[in-house]
């Protein structure tokens, strides 16, 4: 009997020791989580972030602040993690009404005392959404006592709610549509009392530029040896590229000085893993030049044709044209073709009835006669109709006050890409295709998409693409050059989402891209990164009185389904959760 009692006592003591050990491990983990959270919060979201100096934001490429780089690197890591896990870990819902919205695939591999990462993320999202309407916001949430205990309580509350919800309710919640972005007040008609030719002339370079004659289109498929540069933005044929560079880069003895042609390639257009031995770009031809008085020369050039470069043919080290290149780089480039097939019905020979084709009152009847002679259904012909795509694009751009739409199908396809603001993936597809018809079909597929501008650094929403309008005759997106030679791709919008931006420095009228307007640097409210400029009229007769220019290097285009009013805040808190997870590993 004594042996049985001793055995039972020993087993109880062993269980107590195991429980005590688990409690110690859990407490140690919680202590580490608290330390990491406090450190991450202090680094990522200071209570009163001091705005960077004005000089630092003359161009985002010129800033090398340690804090900005650290936050940018941290944000890029999270973006990569989110992209990589998109298929297996869908974004958690912030509502308790959506049980089972997280992936449970990682539950079995974790100790029972550790909260799974997806459950932790869901609980933190809920706490963030509740804290945003309270005094103090997120800072008060993290500075309060027993933060981890409240996270655990929220996790357990969600678990209990999930267990009480039936499978039918879960399926119904999963099928609920994504909340659309908040409805902004209807935009009043924009009355532009401004000469839109001025930005297109880049008059901030001065009035002493001289014209350079010649516009040369090179033969399709031909190979040429020319000077090449790199560029951080994607240029499409027809765009104007202003830049400032050392005049010695273009020697007088170089062939073809009249309308000098050079190549500009885009490293971000072609991912290295796709085809590491090729670079895609455009040929550019200089049409105006002028001295700056500082040993640099102002140039205006226009993109003409798409090219492909074999990296093995590059002689030298290519440099970015926006960063004052100091050495020349030459390479062989091949001119890419542009194939365009006429509309299907235009290939149908109607004989003597063809004379009715251009009579407006007979056009519909003539079309019906054409359709009756083919095996194609009317919908198929309408789907690939060039005039149909042009009309739909015209209706979509009607609110942007653009009246310079080209009539040539090739030029129109490139022009639409610049003014419809496609996602980066779609821009890459439209640039790489040689078929104008395919390019127009890709553009047409985006007509129904509602898109927004998101901060490239923290993913918070900044403006609606429907608020774009043209302050230049070239359209809503234009390349501009600042006094330091950096080139900015600028998108002009009528307004931004409320409480999305802050300001840095003082407003100025020097080197203004829009004569008669002063510019003021704007920052993302969540991450304090440079995202563009506010332009305000200094003359009473100019309209609009205020508009915004979003820097293409600091924003990205995304679908409206990605919008969330918590995007920026939740992103920072999720970033801290990632750091906790990596620290535990």
From Swiss-Prot:
Pfam families: Yippee-Mis18. Expressed in the fat body (at protein level). Residues 178-189 have a biased composition (Pro residues). One of its GO terms (molecular function) is metal ion binding. It comes from Drosophila melanogaster. Gene3D superfamilies: 1.20.58.1480, Peptide methionine sulfoxide reductase. Ubiquitinated. The name 'Ohgata' means 'large' in Japanese and refers to the overgrowth phenotype in mutants. Keywords: Metal-binding, Nucleus, Ubl conjugation, Ubl conjugation pathway, Zinc. Residues 1-109, 156-195 are annotated as: Disordered. The lineage of its organism: Eukaryota, Metazoa, Ecdysozoa, Arthropoda, Hexapoda. It is found in: Nucleus. This is Protein cereblon.
